């Protein structure tokens, strides 16, 4: 998709206290030989373009999502010159809660996800490092800094220093340390940050003052079309570039071309379990929980970067259409993407589940929340935590919830529920190549339990393109 490009660059060399220079239109991408710190301004309730943010959910609207998809292409082509990114850093969602309902800020992560799909990770996946794998997506760093504590958020199972994200309020100066380390490491390339205006301005200001760059930084919010870059030469000189994407998104949820075909039939072997004890072991009633697995992961064993691949972006963006008429949740949940995982050779932020169902929440204007108690690789504890969270809390009675998560946790959850109801039935394994199934757990008015897989997304992984959609 074509859109006009306008790039204005204001240069102020480090060590020079020059006044603001005239804006000169240009279309020159950043120099790959410099350390380029690129700041993408995500929108929030305080700083946004008209109709990009839903005031009730503090999430993107269809228009805001379309802007992020268009922005990714502009960022890749016009700012990076189609070069590959070195690092992507997004706001830790639970550090910025909005509205009286305290919704986490998923906008920075969603804003930069399409850009991550346009870049590639190339990393080792064996101990000797002789074998490299190039993925059709890039990882996003969004995990908590070492020692960082967030009110109401469970501490991570392990700290991931290499996948630190951005803290909205810069707790402990962690954002400053992140930028300072990148400058000190002095590895040429492109480092992209996605955060709200308040946080971004603070990051640029501290970097400017600490290093004595004397750059003439913007003093006020100029809208989501602007992208700022501080570029540092090998000699240590710095300059500021201000880019204007001139993007005009459509006002509705973005369509896909081609639109993935959706089938009414499901491939998984059907099952149906029910249990009706005299006294149900859980307290909730009239509740439905839809379990959906994250979108397509990397197909190579023992290699992981926490994100999904290009096919997954097609699936995630197609979910609103694929699920229309099949499910009817009134709220959406996923695990906190700031929780980290490890493949043995590479640590990563686990963004895949939350980003899979984010477009569905956007398209349907649904409340979106994150849970930090459901962590990776801790099945026994997680199973009971999940049961207590969703089925022993009255806030979920009389509601339908969509949960995007990790497929290995679903069978233990269902089996534990059945066992608690006195049933000897156990859930089947969820096939490793199955990204399409939906497991539905229902409690009726008396608390009786049924579980089945009678519906599915209807999207065939094999028919999805292996390159990301273009906008």
Predicted regions located by residue number:
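C-terminal motif of bacterial Sec signal peptides marking the signal peptidase cleavage site
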Residues: 13-15
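Active-site-proximal alpha-helix that buttresses catalytic centers in soluble enzyme cores
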Residues: 21-180, 186-188, 200, 204-394, ...
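C-terminal active-site subregion of NodB/CE4 polysaccharide deacetylases
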Residues: 397-399
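Bacterial signal peptide processing site
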Residues: 17-19
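Sec-dependent signal peptide recognition
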Residues: 1-7
